[in-house]
Amino acid sequence: MSPELEKVIHDLTLRMLLIRAIQEGDSPSSLTEREALILQQLLERPQMTISEIAESWPNVSESTISMTITRLWREKAYVSKIIKPDNQRVTLVQITDKGKTAIQKHLAQQAERYNTLFQAINATPEEKEMLIRICRRGIEYLDTHLAQMQKPTAKP
């Protein structure tokens, strides 16, 4: 990556994060990135074990994921925990209606920030189409990379 492109991406990311921080402030209902991603996982799969959720986070310990889920459960009531009936050693996590509302609001705010940006820069239809193609290629690469990261490593 060229130094200029690296700087532009860094600067854009920083400014988007600053705007998010200013808009959300220290609201107790605001979500960290990890909380938001866990809630998105639970939207896709309504019941998951903590281990299943943690599998998506190869460089994050299961205890860190467990602490995040506990915060979503105790402090925010965005998830509920259920003991699995056929194996009482396993706890299932599911998103609550309050959690669904929170993640939908979070995603809507995120979309609004990008919409505001794209309207402000007055991109032409061709530029928007090019950006879509570039983003899709990036998503394709990242999906492949994530799949590789999540594969269990063979133990000697």
What are the roles of these predicted feature ranges?
Residues 1-33:
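N-terminal leader segment of winged-helix/HTH proteins
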Residues 7, 11, 37, 130-137:
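Amphipathic alpha-helical interaction segments
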Residues 13-16, 20, 76, 139-143:
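A structural signal for well-ordered alpha-helices, especially hydrophobic packing surfaces
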Residues 21-64:
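N-terminal helix-turn-helix DNA-binding core of bacterial DNA-binding proteins
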Residues 68-71:
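Residues within the DNA-recognition helix of helix-turn-helix
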Residues 73-129:
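Charged, amphipathic alpha-helical coiled-coil/dimerization segments
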Residues 108, 112-156:
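Terminal interaction helix/tail motif
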